[in-house]
Regions:
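Conserved catalytic core of two-metal-ion nucleotidyltransferases
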Residues: 3-33, 76-135, 153-160, 164-240, ...
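Active-site nucleotide-donor binding segment shared across nucleotidyl transfer reactions
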Residues: 27-60, 64, 69-70
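Tryptophan-centric aromatic hotspots in well-structured domains and transmembrane helices
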Residues: 38, 43, 55-56, 215, ...
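Short, conserved acidic/polar surface loops in the N-terminal third of protein domains
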Residues: 50, 74-75, 139
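Long, hydrophobic, well-ordered secondary-structure blocks that form the structural core
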Residues: 54, 64, 69-74, 78-87
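Short, surface-exposed, charged/polar-biased interaction segments
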Residues: 58, 65, 93, 148, ...
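Aromatic- and glycine-enriched beta-alpha-beta binding-site module
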Residues: 132, 144-146
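A short secondary-structure junction signal
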Residues: 136-143
Length: 272
C-alpha cells in the first residue's frame, strides 16, 4: 500500500463522520421547512447493505425534486451552521451542475478536480435535482440520456486550444443540441407521470425510476440515525446497480478521492 492510499484509509472514517454531520444539518433544515429529500446512490446502497457508509465510500448523495432543490437553495445559506456553505454553479465557478453543502474546515480532492477554478474543495454532501421524465422506454433514456450527459461534460471541461479541441467543440456541441431536441420532443409528446430521475445533464447512466418507487418517502437507518429514503429501496437500487447486494471484489473497493484531509484546523483550535 502506497503512502497516499494509507493516508486516505487512515482518515476515511473521520471524513465519513464529518459528512454525516453535514447530512444531519441538511435533514434539520429540510424538516423545519417541509422540504423533501431522500438518500440516493451509494449512500442508499450503504444504508441497505451495510446499515451506514459503504466501508470504502467517501461521499454522501441525496436527491430532491427540482422545485424542492430550488427552495433549499434559497433557504440554506441563512440556515446552515457556521463552517458550512451551500455551493452551486451560481455561487461559485464549479465544474459540476449540482449543489453541494461543503465543509470549509477540510480538503477533498477528486480525480478530475480543476485547480484552475477557484471554488471550495472541502468535504461535501451532493444534492441531485430530480425531474419528471416522459413515458419513454428505458433503452431510449439510456441512449439519449447518456449521450446528452457526456456531451455536456465534454463541452464544459477545460480545453487547450488545438484543432482537435475545436473539432470536439463543434462535434459534441451539435450532438448535444440534437439530443436536446429529441428530449424536447419526448417531453412534448409523452406524458410525464410515471418516471422521475436526475436532470438530463447529470444522468450519465440513463437511469429512470418509477415515481411509485420513490414516493411517498419512507425512512431508513444510516449510521444509527434515520433519514428519508425512497418508498421502495429495492426497486430504486435495482435500477441503479441490478444485483446491488453483491459486494464487489477487494480490488474494486477503492476510495474515490485522490486526497482527503478531514480537518484543516483541529476543532479544539477552532473553538478558541
Amino acid at each position: 500500500m502506497d503512502y497516499i492510499t494509507e493516508f486516505k484509509q487512515r482518515h476515511l472514517r473521520r471524513a465519513q463522520l464529518k459528512q454525516l454531520s453535514i447530512l444531519e444539518e441538511i435533514d434539520r433544515i429540510c424538516r423545519k421547512h417541509d422540504i423533501e429529500y431522500w438518500l440516493d446512490g451509494g449512500t442508499l446502497l450503504g444504508a441497505v447493505r451495510h446499515g451506514g457508509f459503504i466501508p470504502w465510500d467517501d461521499d454522501i448523495d441525496i436527491a430532491m425534486t427540482l422545485d424542492d432543490s430550488r427552495r433549499f437553495a434559497e433557504i440554506a445559506p441563512n440556515e446552515l451552521r457556521s463552517g458550512l456553505v451551500l455551493q452551486t454553479p451560481e455561487t461559485e465557478n464549479t465544474r459540476e451542475p449540482i449543489m453541494k453543502v461543503r465543509d470549509l474546515n477540510s480538503f477533498y480532492v477528486e480525480g478530475n478536480e480543476d485547480f484552475s477554478l477557484d471554488y471550495s474543495k472541502g468535504l461535501f454532501v451532493d444534492i441531485f435535482p430530480f425531474i419528471p421524465y416522459p413515458n419513454v422506454s428505458r433503452s431510449f433514456c439510456k441512449r439519449y440520456g447518456k449521450a446528452m450527459s457526456k456531451c455536456y461534460s465534454i463541452l464544459h471541461h477545460s480545453h487547450q486550444y488545438s484543432w482537435r479541441a475545436t473539432f470536439e467543440l463543434f462535434y459534441f456541441g451539435a450532438k448535444f443540441l440534437f439530443c436536446k431536441s429529441v428530449w424536447a420532443a419526448a417531453f412534448a409528446l409523452r406524458k410525464c407521470d410515471t418516471y422521475i430521475s436526475n436532470v438530463l445533464i447529470n444522468n450519465g447512466y440513463g437511469i429512470m425510476h418509477r415515481r411509485d418507487c420513490v414516493f411517498p418517502l419512507s425512512t431508513i437507518e444510516f449510521e444509527g440515525k434515520r433519514f428519508a429514503a425512497p418508498a421502495d429501496p429495492d426497486a430504486y437500487l435495482s435500477d441503479l446497480y441490478r444485483n446491488y447486494m453483491q459486494v464487489p471484489p477487494k480490488e474494486k473497493q477503492k476510495v474515490h478521492a485522490v486526497f482527503i484531509l478531514p480537518d484543516l484546523i483541529e476543532e479544539a483550535e477552532v473553538k478558541k
